[in-house]
Amino acid sequence: MTLFGATLALLDRESIPCALIGAGALAVHGIPRSTYDIDLLATSARVLDDTLWASMVEQGVDVDVRRGDRSDPLRGVVRLKQGTDRDVDIVVGRHHWQGDVIARARRARIQGEEVPVALKNDLILLKLFAGGHQDMWDIEQLLVDGDADVHAAVDAAISELPDDCQARWAALSRRG
């Protein structure tokens, strides 16, 4: 079993919902972008508990748990590494809207595993929240087909995000 598969199995066994985000999710939506790691989103604080990963550590997985403080926009990040397998990063969100992203995700087969994948509009919300240059490029690629339903879904949810995210969305929307 791959590191990705083992991670999904553990999260499933522990009833911790997650969704594929990042370049893997972009690829599902037809936007190829090269990356070595696989990114998952979760919101359960249990993901940051070292004891959750004990069985994987026993199997030789390197687990790096980084907890955010109260001022951090994320609860934290967990990076899993094992040999030459693709790294798995679990971004642990702290906001209700991030849980909604996971709840709306649709299942797809990725690297032989069934995994919930964030919808296009939800990837846009996550990218607006991250706010980097690559994130803005990714948003432009997600919008290239001009899907009015995607725009409408982002418009409907954007008020849940911080003001700077709303401003970025307004600027992107004006550009067309």
Task: Briefly describe each language-model feature range.
Residues 1-176:
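Compositionally biased terminal segments of proteins
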